[in-house]
């Protein structure tokens, strides 16, 4: 809170991960306390832990009482490709996006653009169509893949699954921004 004067009206707390929703009890307490001091709160999430099953759903709704904004990563709209990329289905992620729209919770959608994995035109079109069904999207961002973290995998002796994948070129980035209509949301 010592930085609150520096933030003025444009700052706050963003919790990212790993996956912050795996620590939902902590988040509820942390954000509740932040709100007591008038601090803006944001969750940066991949959304996979989301479920409408109890007890998670009640806790999630309580957390939303203290959350101002969510940054939601939709890595791939195509479920088969999403499973290939991440190892799990995107069903919970898309359901979370729909639920956040139902409750009118502000969201920024973020899409990591990885050549030959998440940059297919037909999938970008489908993602755009999905985003169009949501009433709460304030911003859409294309995040071009980069190799800055590859050394961490090498240091740990873990095979880097994207070894040899190059960042997208300006054309592919521009194409994704156009298809996802990012300029409409800025």
Regions found by a protein language model. Give the residues of each.
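A structural motif corresponding to the C-terminal lobe/cap of the Radical SAM core domain
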Residues: 129, 138, 154-179
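Radical SAM enzyme core and accessory elements
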Residues: 182-186
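Conserved AdoMet/S-adenosylmethionine-binding subsite of the radical SAM
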Residues: 2-12, 17, 21-143, 148
């Amino acid at each position: 809170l010592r930085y609150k004067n520096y933030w003025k009206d444009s700052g706050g707390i963003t919790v990212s991960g790993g996956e912050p929703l795996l620590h939902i009890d902590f988040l509820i307490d942390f954000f509740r306390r932040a709100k007591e001091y008038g601090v803006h709160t944001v969750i940066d999430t991949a959304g996979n832990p989301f479920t409408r099953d109890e007890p998670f759903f009640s806790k999630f709704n309580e957390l939303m009482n203290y959350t101002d904004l969510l940054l939601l990563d939709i890595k791939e709209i195509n479920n088969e490709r999403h499973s290939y990329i991440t190892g799990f289905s995107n069903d919970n992620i898309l359901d979370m996006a729909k639920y956040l729209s139902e409750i009118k919770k502000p969201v920024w959608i973020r899409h990591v653009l990885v050549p030959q994995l998440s940059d297919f035109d037909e999938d970008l079109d489908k993602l755009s169509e999905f985003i169009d069904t949501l009433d709460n999207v304030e911003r859409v961002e294309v995040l071009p893949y980069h190799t800055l973290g590859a050394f961490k995998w090498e240091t740990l002796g873990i095979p880097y699954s994207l070894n040899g994948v190059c960042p997208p070129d300006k054309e592919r980035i521009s194409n994704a921004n156009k298809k996802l209509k990012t300029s409409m949301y800025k």
